[in-house]
């Protein structure tokens, strides 16, 4: 039986897709539709070479999925005819979903109910699920939740020091994101160290335009930096991460900012973009560090925040840390950021191997600390699509 899984990741203005063989991990197709709802909506894909096409003025998720089915997959019948199931990345599953789920009307309703916790993402996921069901009515659909891996966090880690009824009645707590990536890295470290997953203790840094840290104890998430939403925690591309909540009142009451303006500023105009006042692109920050004041400022704040989180999470692991790991677009490719962060953690006996660190870029992986380092640090490429494909195959009975 075929184990080809169509993996869909619908963002607020994008649709990422791939066809993955859940049995051997081979990726037969990958692509991205971006700038959806805008005049420049376009789609790029890799299938027997690289391709790109315009989707038309204001094209939405439905049009992008239709193009993928009717144009891209139609050009490769051996793929479309052998698709066995569809897996969907879903950002927020709240407390209702502690693991991946076969999509039923009840599960779809649950995803809709969680939309208040991820208003930019969950509605887009629902559109993608319904469009996929329409395009492939015979295939089973599976939801794989970013929040599920973090449902093992203890109460002391996920509760906020707010009136307890806000949690009991409204579910206001830490949920965390990037769970699928953190899970994949945990499994990879177990394999590299030749240990059962249940014995792995790591601190994983998933660094991209969105970024989070996760403390993993005995193979389970015990703390993570993102909170109720993906806004909390690290400095990100355009998101502020941790701030004094009273800043919001000051912006509103003293400076006259509207709630909408504050929300836009914290989510789309802060982070690296806010600190540089130029760009959210980490490559600019890295290339101009020490030369341009704005780049130096942004990189120092980014690395300070990340090192502080990593150091703090050692306390949750109670004495044993097998590895510090870096993944995601920045984590996998930015040798300077990795070195700056690890050098700030010298108190733990960490020694960076600068040559190995420099080699571990652009698909390179491996240990980036010296043999004398008390704690190893590793670069590992994440593969969320594979985790989604594997869970989908399992739940779809492939």
Swiss-Prot record:
Predominant localisation class: cytoplasm
Top-level taxon: Bacteria
Cofactor needs: Mg(2+); Mn(2+)
UniProt site positions, description: Transition state stabilizer: 178, 239
Location in the cell: Cytoplasm
Residues annotated to bind Mg(2+): 9, 384
Enzyme Commission number(s) of this protein: 2.7.2.1
Active site, UniProt feature: 146
Alphabetized NCBIfam families for the sequence: ackA
Protein name: Acetate kinase 1
């Amino acid at each position: 039986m075929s184990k080809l899984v169509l993996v869909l990741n619908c963002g607020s203005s994008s649709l990422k897709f791939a066809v993955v063989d859940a049995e051997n991990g081979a990726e037969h197709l990958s692509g991205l539709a971006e700038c959806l709802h805008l005049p420049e909506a376009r789609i790029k894909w890799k299938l027997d070479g690289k391709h790109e096409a315009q989707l038309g003025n204001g094209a939405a998720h439905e049009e992008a999925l239709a193009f993928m089915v009717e144009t891209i997959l139609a050009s490769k019948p051996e793929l479309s005819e052998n698709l066995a199931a569809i897996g969907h990345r879903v950002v927020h599953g709240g407390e209702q979903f502690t693991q991946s789920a076969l999509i039923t009307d009840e599960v779809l309703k649950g995803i809709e109910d969680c939309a208040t916790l991820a208003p930019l993402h969950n509605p887009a996921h629902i559109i993608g699920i319904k469009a996929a069901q329409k395009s492939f009515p015979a295939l089973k659909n599976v939801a794989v939740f970013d929040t599920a891996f973090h449902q093992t966090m203890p109460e002391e880690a996920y509760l906020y020091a707010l009136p307890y009824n806000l949690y009991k009645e409204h579910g206001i707590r830490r949920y965390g994101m990037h769970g699928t990536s953190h899970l994949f890295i945990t499994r990879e470290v177990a394999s590299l160290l030749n240990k059962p997953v249940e014995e792995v203790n790591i601190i994983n840094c998933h660094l991209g335009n969105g970024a989070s840290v996760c403390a993993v104890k005995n193979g389970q998430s015990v703390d993570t930096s993102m909170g109720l939403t993906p806004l909390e925690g690290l400095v990100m591309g355009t998101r502020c991460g941790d701030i004094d909540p009273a800043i919001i009142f000051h912006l509103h009451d003293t400076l006259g900012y509207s709630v909408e303006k504050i929300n836009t500023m914290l989510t789309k105009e802060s982070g690296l973009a806010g600190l540089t006042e130029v760009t959210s692109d980490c490559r600019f920050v890295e290339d101009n560090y020490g030369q341009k004041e704005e780049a130096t400022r942004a990189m120092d704040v980014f690395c300070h925040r990340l090192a502080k989180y990593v150091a703090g999470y050692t306390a949750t692991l109670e004495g044993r840390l097998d590895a510090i790991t870096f993944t995601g677009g920045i984590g996998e490719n930015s040798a300077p950021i990795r070195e700056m962060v690890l050098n700030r953690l010298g108190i733990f006996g960490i020694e960076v191997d600068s040559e190995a660190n420099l080699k571990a870029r652009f698909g390179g992986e491996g240990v980036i600390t010296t043999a004398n380092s008390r704690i190893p640090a590793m670069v590992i490429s994440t593969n969320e699509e594979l985790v989604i494909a594997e869970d989908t195959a399992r739940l779809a009975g492939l």
